[in-house]
Amino acid sequence: ENGLALEHDISNVKHFAQRGIVYITLCHNGDNDICDSARGCNTHNGVSSFGEKVIQEMNRLGIMVDLSHGGEKSFYDALDISQTPIVCSHSSSRALCDVPRNLTDDQMRALAAKGGVAHTTLYHGFLRTQGEATIIDAISHLEHAIDVMGIDHVGIGTDFDGDGGVR
């Protein structure tokens, strides 16, 4: 999680591919040299020129582009740049929980139109803004995503390694 591990060296995409990496989350909780984060400062106004090369190399090597944590402009830029479907490995619905990390309905529709998948996260702060998140909240996000995108474009991305979990 976070393309910062590429260390601004495009050859590291191949390095990681050769070691079995199947997807790279382009950014995390802040802008990096690849793209702007949902919690960033809009450093590049979306995907940077280096980020465009990274996405193209990921496509060439069969590594999935993951836009969880990406800012909205980064999301649409990556969707335009990528020649393969992208994923959002742990992103919920902004219509149900209004935080910048979650996907708008328009983003969900655009992702589905390009063959991508949005995985609803079980991280409590992205399921509800107040109170304790429950499995019912997670199901509501899944049902909403299915209604917007169709079931073929919806998955579950628990984020258990990033403090995910509901009661």
Task: Give, region by region, the residue ranges found by the protein language model.
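Extended, charged catalytic domains and RNA/DNA-binding interfaces, predominantly
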Residues: 1-131, 138-146, 153
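Short acidic/histidine-rich active-site segments
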Residues: 121-122, 149-167
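Outer-membrane beta-barrel pore domains
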Residues: 129-135, 164-167
